UniProtKB/Swiss-Prot annotation:
Cecropins have lytic and antibacterial activity against several Gram-positive and Gram-negative bacteria. Residues 1-22 form the signal peptide. It comes from the Eukaryota. This is Cecropin-A. Residues 23-26 form a propeptide. Belongs to the cecropin family. It comes from Hyalophora cecropia. A protein with the same sequence as cecropin A, but lacking the carboxyl blocking group, has been isolated and called cecropin C. The modification Lysine amide is found at residue 63. Keywords: Amidation, Antibiotic, Antimicrobial, Immunity, Innate immunity, Secreted, Signal. Disulfide bonds: none annotated. It is found in: Secreted.
Length: 64
């Protein structure tokens, strides 16, 4: 009887520790992925800026 109570207490403590330690990890990974996507979009827009300007000038030259 005492062994089962001790076993249950140890199991409950280990489960609680596992949940507390594992909880923040996925949240931060999700935000880091979102941040990385935002940085890639920003960098793509910055790199595409001169090309868009050249295309705009070319269309104006073509229109006359």
């Amino acid at each position: 009887m005492n062994f089962s109570r001790i076993f249950f207490f140890v199991f409950a403590c280990l489960t609680a520790l596992a949940m507390v330690n594992a909880a923040p990890e996925p949240k931060w990974k999700l935000f880091k992925k979102i941040e990385k996507v935002g940085q890639n979009i920003r960098d793509g827009i910055i790199k595409a800026g001169p090309a868009v300007a050249v295309v705009g000038q070319a269309t104006q030259i073509a229109k006359g």
